[in-house]
Curated annotation (Swiss-Prot):
Ranges in the topological domain labelled Extracellular: 209-239, 292-309, 368-379, 400-406
Name this polypeptide is given: Delayed-rectifier potassium channel regulatory subunit KCNS1
Subcellular location: Cell membrane
Quaternary state and interactors: Heterotetramer with KCNB1. Heterotetramer with KCNB2. Does not form homomultimers.
Stretch list, region Disordered: 464-497
Coiled-coil residue windows: none
Domain remark from Swiss-Prot or TrEMBL: The transmembrane segment S4 functions as a voltage-sensor and is characterized by a series of positively charged amino acids at every third position. Channel opening and closing is effected by a conformation change that affects the position and orientation of the voltage-sensor paddle formed by S3 and S4 within the membrane. A transmembrane electric field that is positive inside would push the positively charged S4 segment outwards, thereby opening the pore, while a field that is negative inside would pull the S4 segment inwards and close the pore.
Biased composition, class Basic and acidic residues, residue ranges: 470-482
Listed SMART domains: BTB (SM00225)
Source organism (scientific name): Rattus norvegicus
Amino acid sequence: MVSEFPGPGSRVPWRPRDEALRVNVGGVRRLLSARALARFPGTRLGRLQAAVSEEQARRLCDDYDAAAREFYFDRHPGFFLGLLHFYRTGHLHVLDELCVFAFGQEADYWGLGENALATCCRARYLERRVTRPRAWDEDSDAPSSVDPCPDEISDVQRELARYGAARCGRLRRRLWLTMENPGYSLPSKLFSCVSIGVVLASIAAMCIHSLPEYQAREAAAAVAAVAAGRSAEDVRDDPVLRRLEYFCIAWFSFEVSSRLLLAPSTRNFFCHPLNLIDIVSVLPFYLTLLAGAALGDRRGASGEELGDLGKVVQVFRLMRIFRVLKLARHSTGLRSLGATLKHSYREVGILLLYLAVGVSVFSGVAYTAEEKNVGFDTIPACWWWGTVSMTTVGYGDVVPETVAGKLAASGCILGGILVVALPITIIFNKFSHFYRRQKALEAAVRSSGQREFEDLLSSVDGVSDVSLETSRETSQEGRSTDLETQAPSEPAKSHSY
């Protein structure tokens, strides 16, 4: 009988070399013959079979049960079944259930190279590996999957799970989904339509207010009215437009405060770009009120000081144009555009660099070739002409007259077409990707009528501290659970390979 724990001076191997290898891979138990493993000594299981000591064997597996003489591997069980087929036939086939990245990791772990792939699967694997998409924030232009990322779904799940321990969690969650997801229910669609209408009405009122017939007074008249003790708003604004502005501000303030109260996390609320846009859309109004109060408190100030405060008020009023960005909350295209610009900063930087180089070169040529009295007096003045020409805008305010200047203008225009077209194609492909991805994510999480989303909500409702703790313990003791699936009195079915 071979001793499992030989003494330091013993020369008896720790296990017979012809003994079958008992392995457990992710709960799948198999008994592998030594002869089958000896055919592939370079693989992990082949080296494990040839290990001369228990210490060497333990370095090749995740755990070892000396009593059962069983080796445990915390790896993908599906790939292990394909690995068994490899030991039988000598060919490895690609698994469709694993992505190229995960399949390659498993193959590297078990000590298999590309030569182990079967001929029928090798070309497909190599093609998928070459075109395997990488993260958009890397130097990659290959389009990735349009399916929602598991991390994005997990973020939604974590946000919803925060309502489990909150007071009135179910009601707050439904109200939050109603405000955040236009397709969640009929009330959410109505709320979205009303919000879009208020945004458009606010923008229309701001544009109409700039027309001459709606401006009863100029800025100087407003300052004079404040000095006389009257309100500048009463002088400058049309009563109808002023009431419409107050209504829009009340609605925007209601939206911001409601989202803040219903948000699952206050910290995440202030980190979300759309919420910051909502705050910026109402902030100018309240800053204008503060500036108006400051004007009212300084009636004895000089006209120059009042004029400066009046300019500050005008700047605050112009900031209302940022309200148009509120439409991004209700527009998949605008959100996709924002994500595209966020992940295309390299391409945008390259585009600006190309334009800067081209403008500098052709501006210098035009400055040298043209006369000084036709708009090319200085190189900075030529920069304007070069920028307009390279972007193919062509205002026509500055036109070269000499032959050399016209040749430089032709080269500037052709160079602009080539320079702008190259990065634009990459940016457009990324926009198409993020648009499809955003649509897929919305379809996965916003409709409560779908079975997946209902299961998600019900799982969030049913989560308790006990179930969470039980789930945590189950995940931590997954390996022991797999080992206990078969009673000791009932030996596992062994297969020799």
